[in-house]
Amino acid sequence: MPLSNNVIGCINFITVLLSIPVIGAGIWLAIGTVNSCVKLLQWPVIILGVLILLVGLAGFIGGFWRITWLLVVYLIAMLILIVLLGCLVGFIYMVTIRGSGHPEPSRAYLEYSLQDFSGWLRRRVQRSYKWERIRTCLSTTTICPELNQRYTLAQDFFNAHLDPIQSGCCKPPTKCGFTFVNPTYWISPIDMSADMDCLNWSNDQNTLCYTCDSCKAGLLANIKVDWLKADIFLLLALIGLIIVYIIGCCAFRNAETEDIFRKYKQGYT
């Protein structure tokens, strides 16, 4: 027995609801303190979510008001969007699967290396003109200054579980051998390492280690964590859309619009 138009409309309305986590994931990535300084996939995710919302509304309207051509547009467009969302979910996973912190002796926080991350992510921060914009944005946040309010003793700081970006941007790398004064002010050793990150460190609060590769690595580590969280929501939305799409195809075939297929067959008999 064919499904009623109301049931078809309700099934397609679920598609509208499933667009919410996609749009929400994009907005969440866009408004985060770190992600707001790096414009990567936030807008593609939001745009894809909005398209899913609009196509879902088209299917909802087509189902309730028996607008056959609108249902056909819905099925074709939704298939394309499902494929695009699947590619996006896979892409995010592939570019974030690499990259993790390295422990240092007598430190609770981790150190990060730029070379540990995927080439695609590295290219987003290695170009000087891109990093200058990101660096300027990061230097205006409270990511580093808040550490001075939180930790006054060296041992408390060394036992702290810092965010990757705080570990990479707000202090010199541990291997440089600097002496702690406060989280963002360090005394350099007499025989300082020739490592570029050690040379790039500055006690100027607007500079710190924002030009260091460790800062770029810390930024990517933060992005990786946020993107993997967003990817979970996108994956759940993808699974839901696939299920709804399959049900929608069956409903379209068995509903009252089956007379279109009957006329199509009669044309060949």
Swiss-Prot record:
Cytoplasmic side: 1-10, 66-71, 253-269
Biological process terms in GO annotation: auxin-activated signaling pathway; leaf vascular tissue pattern formation; megasporogenesis; meristem structural organization; radial pattern formation; regulation of meristem structural organization; root morphogenesis
Extracellular face residues: 32-44, 93-231
Classification via Pfam families: Tetraspanin (PF00335)
Localisation: Membrane
Inactivation phenotype: Severe dwarfism combined with twisted and malformed organs, and sterility. Loss of initial meristematic divisions in the epidermal/lateral root cap. Defection in basipetal transport of auxin (IAA) leading to several development aberrations.
Tissue: Expressed in seedlings, roots, leaves, stems, apex, siliques and flowers. Present in ovules, prominently in nucellus and integuments.
InterPro entries (alphabetical): TET_plant, Tetraspanin/Peripherin
GO annotation, cellular component aspect: membrane; plasmodesma
Membrane topology qualifier: Multi-pass membrane protein
Regions that span the bilayer: 11-31, 45-65, 72-92, 232-252
Superkingdom to which the source organism belongs: Eukaryota
Keywords per UniProt: Auxin signaling pathway, Developmental protein, Glycoprotein, Membrane, Transmembrane, Transmembrane helix
The keyword Isomerase is assigned to this record: no
Glycosylated residues in this chain: N200
Family the UniProt entry places it in: Belongs to the tetraspanin (TM4SF) family.
Additional detail: 'Ekeko' is derived from Inca language (quechua) for small and hunchbacked fortune god.
Function of the molecule: Involved in the basipetal transport of auxin (IAA) that modulates growth and organs organization, as well as cell differentiation. Regulates shoot apical meristem (SAM) organization in the peripheral zone. Required for initial meristematic divisions in the epidermal/lateral root cap leading to the formation of epidermal cells and a clone of lateral root cap cells, as well as for the maintenance of the radial pattern of cell specification in the root, thus regulating the distinction between the lateral root cap and epidermis. Together with WIH peptides, promotes megasporogenesis.
Protein name: Protein TORNADO 2
Organism for this UniProt entry: Arabidopsis thaliana
